[in-house]
Regions:
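N-terminal alpha-helical targeting/anchoring segments
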Residues: 1-132
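Active-site loop/lid in soluble adenylation, ligation, and acyl-transfer enzymes
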Residues: 111-129, 136-268
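Short histidine-centered catalytic/ligand-binding loop motif
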Residues: 163-173, 288-300
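Short glycine/proline-enriched loop/turn "hinge" motifs that connect secondary-structure elements
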Residues: 275-281
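Extended C-terminal subregions enriched in glycine
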Residues: 296-333
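Conserved small/polar residues in nucleotide/adenosyl-binding loops
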Residues: 334-343
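Hydrophobic alpha-helical segments, chiefly the membrane-spanning helices
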Residues: 346-352
């Protein structure tokens, strides 16, 4: 979330970033307006406190002069001012909550190298690794492979959960575990601490790591406890140190997390691909670094290097894409820059 001083002192920078993203400026102006209203309320509250303190000083003088009636009048005035202060503090806190809730929806300022584009067609190639494999036979699709080997049971999963869930079985289930272990060990060798996070988070923690206004639509909520099933391991790993001040000498803090994740995936996927690509429950491995802002760009490159080195170690052909402004998405407003690695999935039955 952008610091409030950015809105007060560098609003033009935020407006220019919105223009780059193709977003209207309305919410920026609203945040500035709400901030001014909050500051006005804060000023009024401070004035009431000063008036209360000044009045309270007269109580002793009135009692010393033996004027009990005047002392009581001042006491009543102080009590009345105390109630006004309490009411004003409630209004001030509410104004700050409304301002900050809207401020959370304002994207971070993009890195200068992020390409400008309306959608994914504006993404640019960053790097290509390896060569596309060629075969002397016609490769089978993922659908064919899982059916002939009975590695996935979709029908029985649908009986107990609905669509886009599956039972993973046999060697394919073992392969998934093996890949998780391989990736974790790969990063542990680079001094990343292995963490298994909770798969539920409360609302307060979630609001600290993403804009729930947009992301909440793809999440599973648990009533009446106000918990959410996590949509990515990144969220609990980032929230782990909420309300804490991390000593500078402890940074950067490198972590690798593995967890089950849950999303209400929507769209046309599910017919030709048997519903195994856009699913509601899946495993994610995330690498997270908590660091000082001035070190963040170098560490972004470290994260990208880890990712490409992992793909290289598996001998898989892939490309790295520099995500453009229009493809960042509203749930990616925390991103200042983003890269995606896209592997060559030989056996996938493509929908295009």
């Amino acid at each position: 979330m952008l610091d409030m001083n950015m809105f007060r002192e560098h609003a033009d920078v935020i407006r220019a970033d919105h223009t780059k993203r193709g977003l209207p400026h309305d919410n920026i102006e609203k945040v500035i307006e709400l901030d001014q209203a909050w500051r006005n309320l804060l000023h009024e509250t401070d004035q009431l406190r000063r008036a209360k303190n000044e009045a309270a000083r007269g109580i002793g003088a009135a009692k010393k002069a033996g004027d009990n009636e005047a002392a009581q009048a001042i006491l009543n005035q102080v009590a009345d001012l105390g109630q006004k202060i309490a009411d004003m503090e409630a209004k001030t806190n509410e104004a700050m909550t409304v301002r900050d809730r809207l401020r959370m929806s304002i994207p971070n300022i993009l890195h200068k190298d992020v390409p400008v584009g309306a959608d994914e067609s504006g993404n640019t190639a960053y790097a290509v690794h390896g060569t596309k494999p060629e075969f002397s036979f016609e490769p089978r699709t993922h659908n064919e492979l899982i059916e002939m080997n009975k590695w996935v049971d979709l029908k029985r999963a649908a009986k107990i959960t609905g669509s886009r869930f599956y039972f993973l079985k046999g060697d394919l289930a073992r392969l998934e575990f093996a890949l998780q272990q391989y990736a974790v060990d790969f990063l542990r060798q680079r001094d990343y601490t292995f963490v298994q996070p909770p798969v539920m988070m409360n609302r307060e923690a979630y609001e600290g790591v993403t804009d729930l206004g947009d992301f909440e639509t793809v999440m599973y909520g648990i009533e009446p406890d106000k918990y959410y099933m996590i949509a990515t391991s990144e969220h609990p790993l980032t929230a782990m140190y909420m309300d804490e001040t991390i000593p500078e000498e402890q940074m950067p803090m490198r972590m690798v997390g593995v967890s089950q994740c849950f999303r209400r995936e929507v769209g046309s996927h599910g017919q030709s691909d048997l519903g195994i690509w856009r699913v509601h429950q899946f495993t994610k491995i995330e690498q997270i670094i908590i660091a000082k802002p001035e070190d963040s760009w170098a560490l972004h490159e470290e994260l990208l290097q880890n990712c490409t080195d992992l793909w290289d170690s598996l001998g898989i052909h892939y490309e790295v894409v520099n995500i453009c402004t229009g493809d960042m998405g509203t749930v990616s407003y925390t991103h200042l820059r983003a890269h995606e690695t896209k592997a060559n999935l030989v056996c996938r039955l493509l929908l295009e």
